[in-house]
Amino acid sequence: MAKIKVKSAKEIELIRDAGALAAETLILAGEMVKPGVSTLEIDEFIGDYTRKHKGISACMGYHGYPRYACISINEVVCHGIPRADTILKDGDIVNIDITTILSGYHGDTSAMFVAGKASALAQELIDTAKFCMEEGIHAAGEPRARFCDIGCAIQDIADEHGFSVVEDYCGHGIGRGFHEEPTVLHFRNSERTPFIEVGNVFTVEPMINVGKPGTKTLNDGWTAVTRDGSLSAQWEHTIVRTKDGVEILTLPR
């Protein structure tokens, strides 16, 4: 693993500003999740709102990605491309993933929303995925925590509920760069990773599947789906390790 950056107080404040805008945008975008709405409508709102508040949507153009945000429905694990012909239906579970650049620094967050009413299984998945993220964040704030402890905490919760943890995608350091060191694995693994240091800033963003953990990428080169067609859910925050534990940097002001 390459050297993990320790951010200064000023850098953390700038990431917090970007994270707050991302969080505020996410809340408003989530209010648009209703049957009959296209994912493109939601995405256009995200782009417009971000620009209005002097931010930049980091996804647009990143390695050729064509939209402002990733909007992933049901069996889509991540990187769902918003489209005019993708119309939300009653019972759809929807992840909206927003990364905002403000003053040169990134804030990255995502959350789950439901169009109409979710099935009991879908709601359990959504709630479990959120708990997985929360427990991963909690593990990162424990004394002498290592990065591998995050994945162990997440895996324990998923196993308890009979769900699986996606291994093909992971969390990451963040700051001036969208994706920096370290790579944050969300599953239990044997790698003896470094201790988490005060000033390390990174995302915790587990993707939890009802079925098996395997994924595949569709022909558009971006959209990742579960191999077995089962539902998937994800929540994400950007956090910083502090002397007292951790602070979530992607909260609304």
Predicted regions: what they are:
Residues 1-253:
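Active-site neighborhoods and metal-handling regions in enzymes and metal-associated proteins
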